[in-house]
């Protein structure tokens, strides 16, 4: 992919992704070995619940696969009225490859009966998954102890601490550093929160919608043995208290905002912002004068030195596919060092462990030059919880709501967690009653 094309692609690609072990090998997975019938024309259908724009579909899927496998024709099956995945299953028209978002999709597709263990395909095609980040690979598993692999990660999201250099310069405070913990950032936020020249500046903000569901302590929401909520715990109290205190700083509580990103990106009134990938909107912000940089996401002083759990996009080869080998070759190529490097260069963190690929992160994004963007891919992601269930997305939504009641409405943490547990259990029962 030439540099001009990469630059054109990165903005559209970054917007798209923000709205979403076999062996012990080397840097990246070995691609599927060529088969005897490699030149036999075949059509592979692909389903993405969020749908691709024509531009992204052609650039992220069609062109790289056509270049590698000219005999393979890809068809994008759109998620529309009458062609939802459930509709396609009912009509016996399940696509060959299905894309999904994290463990939620694994549970959903498993319930639809369309998943199949991919390890035989991996073995038959000489695919070595040893170069894939094991945390990302495990994040798609219903049971980490199960050797079966139903989906492979193709992309992942992390988070970092972005900061406004101009504000730190203005108030004579030292910049944040890599490797800080939340206690240190809290003290820094207190120094930065103030009113100056009639303008109210906040020291810190974060996006609870990511920080809570993908929490750094790998806390479970629901007990997978009982299907009962498990959030009245010391761990959840620690997370709520650690993040809520930032909103107790005088002048640092904005209340519920219609857009939590604008104060940092546009208004330039937030000194530090802990958030997943915002490199795409930072293009415009940089053009409008925002002098920013980033450091690694702060960690808990008494806990593991990990970032948030990775927000993983997975690829699944359906059980009913009549062209499993060719479908798998498509998946394997998208996980290759070549494609993962191209995507890393336009700002998508690679699912491969290879240091050279990590170092290439955002290299083709001109507005990142001279900035510490390697921090975004330098931390260690938190593993998924020991207990995962199909109800975790429901529970995560309720926990975010309760955290905001604590942060913005002054609700007691113990009360909020008790109420969350009651609501989650009620919603689990409602889901079960639908069966």
Regions found by a protein language model. Name each.
Residues 2-112, 127-129, 175, 254, ...:
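Conserved N-terminal structural module of periplasmic/extracytoplasmic solute-binding proteins
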Residues 47, 208-212, 241-326:
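Extracytoplasmic/periplasmic substrate-binding proteins
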Residues 77-85, 180-187, 253-266:
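Short helix-initiation/N-cap motifs at beta->coil->alpha
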Residues 159-163, 315-316:
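Short glycine- and hydrophobic/aromatic-rich loop-to-beta-strand nucleating segment
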Residues 188-189, 226-256:
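Glycine-centered hinge/linker elements that transmit conformational signals in sensory
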């Amino acid at each position: 992919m030439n540099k001009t094309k990469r630059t054109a692609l990165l903005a559209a690609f970054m917007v798209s992704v923000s709205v979403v072990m076999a062996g012990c090998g080397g840097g990246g997975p070995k691609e599927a070995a060529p088969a005897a019938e490699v030149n036999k024309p075949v059509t592979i259908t692909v389903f993405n619940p969020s749908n691709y724009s024509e531009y992204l579909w052609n650039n992220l899927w069609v062109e790289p696969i056509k270049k590698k496998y000219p005999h393979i024709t890809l068809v994008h099956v759109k998620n529309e009225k009458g062609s939802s995945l459930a509709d396609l299953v009912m009509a016996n028209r399940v696509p060959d490859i299905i894309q999904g978002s994290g463990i939620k999709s694994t549970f959903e597709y498993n319930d639809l009966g369309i998943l199949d263990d991919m390890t035989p395909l991996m073995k038959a095609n000489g695919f070595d998954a040893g170069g894939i980040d094991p945390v990302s690979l495990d994040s798609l598993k219903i049971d980490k102890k199960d050797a079966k692999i139903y989906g492979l990660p193709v992309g992942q999201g992390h988070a970092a601490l972005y900061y406004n250099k101009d504000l730190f310069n203005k108030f004579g405070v030292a910049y944040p550093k890599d490797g800080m913990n939340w206690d240190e950032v809290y003290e820094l936020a207190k120094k930065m929160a103030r009113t100056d020249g009639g303008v109210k500046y906040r020291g810190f903000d974060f996006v609870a919608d990511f920080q809570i569901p993908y929490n750094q302590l790998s806390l479970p929401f629901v007990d997978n043995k009982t299907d009962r909520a498990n959030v009245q715990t010391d761990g959840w109290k620690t997370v709520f208290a650690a993040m809520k205190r930032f909103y107790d700083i005088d002048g640092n509580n904005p209340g519920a905002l219609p857009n939590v990103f604008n104060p940092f990106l546009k208004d330039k009134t937030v000194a530090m912002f802990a958030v997943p990938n915002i490199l795409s909107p930072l293009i415009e912000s940089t053009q409008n004068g925002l002098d920013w940089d980033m450091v690694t996401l702060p960690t808990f002083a008494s806990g593991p030195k990990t970032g948030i759990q990775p927000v993983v996009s997975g690829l699944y080869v359906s059980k009913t596919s009549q062209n499993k080998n060719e479908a798998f070759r498509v998946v394997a190529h998208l996980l290759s060092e070549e494609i993962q490097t191209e995507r890393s260069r336009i700002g998508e963190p690679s699912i491969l462990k290879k240091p050279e690929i990590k170092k290439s992160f955002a290299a083709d994004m001109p507005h990142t030059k001279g900035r510490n963007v390697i921090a975004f891919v330098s931390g260690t992601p938190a593993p998924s919880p020991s207990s995962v269930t199909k109800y975790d997305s429901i529970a995560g939504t309720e926990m975010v709501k309760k955290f905001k009641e604590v942060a913005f409405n002054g609700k007691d943490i113990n009360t909020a967690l008790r109420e969350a547990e009651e609501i989650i259990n009620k919603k689990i029962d409602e889901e079960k009653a639908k069966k």
